[in-house]
Structures are given as structure tokens and as C-alpha cells.
């Protein structure tokens, strides 16, 4: 009973409402023929974790925080390897809300650093036009993990939170080469 109660969010949107946090990530979609009733689509099952700086990081918890930033439509959080470090650093692939042309990097940096512990703030953010999903609408993480922050393998914009900085900066080939040479200071 106590564990179940922890999964129930009360008064989330209205007084006395209740929501059971099942661990499934859903989204509302317009399928065009529901006669005004909402249609929900399964997006992902939450619960993935990775270790960074000797801490366990929940991709679900980080993703929920990122989704709380007004410019973000969807995000997919995963861990990526950095040569010469233990564990995996956080990386988030995000899509921007309709009508948002460019991520406000300063506001996003401030938001994440105020909402997450330092070890959980993703070191890399990849801006994608769409989030890839499987036939069962599960977010695809495998290819993203393999590509990581190697901007030679895709055309998306990447921002990095560099060591000693409190703000994301545009990621370029010079920084990629420093990481590969283990000279970036992570």
C-alpha cells in the first residue's frame, strides 16, 4: 500500500484529481476520427539509467525535467561514453516546440542547472527535427548512443556543457577532436 501510494500523484492538474505513475510515457495525438475524444499513444517505457561521476542517473527523471522547459516538445535521454572517463555522460536528443526556431541556450542552461544535480545535467544536447520511434512507438536510443556526439555522423546541431562552464556552447569538430584525444578535461 505504501509503495503504491508513492506512485499516485494527487491534485496534479485539479484539486482532488489523481494520476497513477505507471512508468509509461504517453502523448496525445490527433488521429482525425475520434469525435472529440483524446487518443493516446505510447511513447516509451521509462526506467533506463546510466552511471556518471559515481552516481546513478535516471533517464526518465532527467527527461521529465527537460520536458518541463517550455521550448522542448520531446526529449530522449541516454548515456554516452567519453574516452578516459568512467561511466557514461548524459546526452539528450530534443525536438523543439512548433514555432521555436532556436533553443534559448542561456535559459535552458540556467533551467537545467537549477532543476538537476550537477552530475545529472546532460553534457550534450542534440537538436533533432523529430524523435525516432519504433513500430510500437518506443523511443529509439540504440542509434543515438552509437552516434553519441560524433557530429561527423549526422547533421543535427549539438551543444555541449564544457568542463568549467555553466552554459551550453555550440559543439564543433575542434571540441570533438579534443574529446577523442582525451584532452577535453571531462
Predicted features by range, described:
Residues 147-159:
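A short, polar/charged loop-to-alpha-helix boundary motif
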Residues 116-139, 156-181:
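AMP-binding/adenylate-forming catalytic domain of the ANL superfamily
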Residues 3-120, 130, 135-139, 143:
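AMP-binding/adenylate-forming catalytic core of the ANL superfamily
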Residues 185-186:
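Long, low-complexity intrinsically disordered regulatory regions
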Amino acid at each position: 500500500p505504501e509503495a503504491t501510494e508513492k506512485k499516485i500523484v494527487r491534485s496534479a492538474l485539479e484539486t482532488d484529481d489523481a494520476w497513477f505513475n505507471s512508468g509509461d510515457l504517453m502523448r496525445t495525438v490527433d488521429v482525425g476520427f475520434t469525435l472529440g475524444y483524446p487518443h493516446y499513444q505510447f511513447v516509451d517505457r521509462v526506467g533506463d539509467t546510466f552511471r556518471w561521476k559515481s552516481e546513478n542517473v535516471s533517464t526518465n527523471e532527467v527527461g521529465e525535467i527537460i520536458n518541463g522547459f517550455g521550448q522542448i516538445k520531446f526529449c530522449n535521454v541516454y548515456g554516452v561514453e567519453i574516452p578516459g572517463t568512467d561511466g557514461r555522460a548524459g546526452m539528450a536528443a530534443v525536438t523543439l516546440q512548433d514555432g521555436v526556431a532556436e533553443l534559448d541556450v542561456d535559459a535552458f542552461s540556467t533551467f537545467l542547472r537549477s532543476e538537476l544535480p550537477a552530475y545529472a545535467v546532460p553534457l550534450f544536447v542534440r537538436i533533432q527535427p523529430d524523435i525516432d520511434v519504433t513500430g510500437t512507438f518506443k523511443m529509439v536510443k540504440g542509434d543515438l548512443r552509437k552516434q553519441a556526439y560524433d557530429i561527423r555522423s549526422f547533421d543535427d546541431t549539438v551543444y555541449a556543457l564544457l568542463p568549467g562552464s555553466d552554459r551550453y556552447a555550440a559543439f564543433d569538430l575542434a571540441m570533438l577532436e579534443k574529446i577523442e584525444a582525451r584532452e577535453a578535461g571531462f
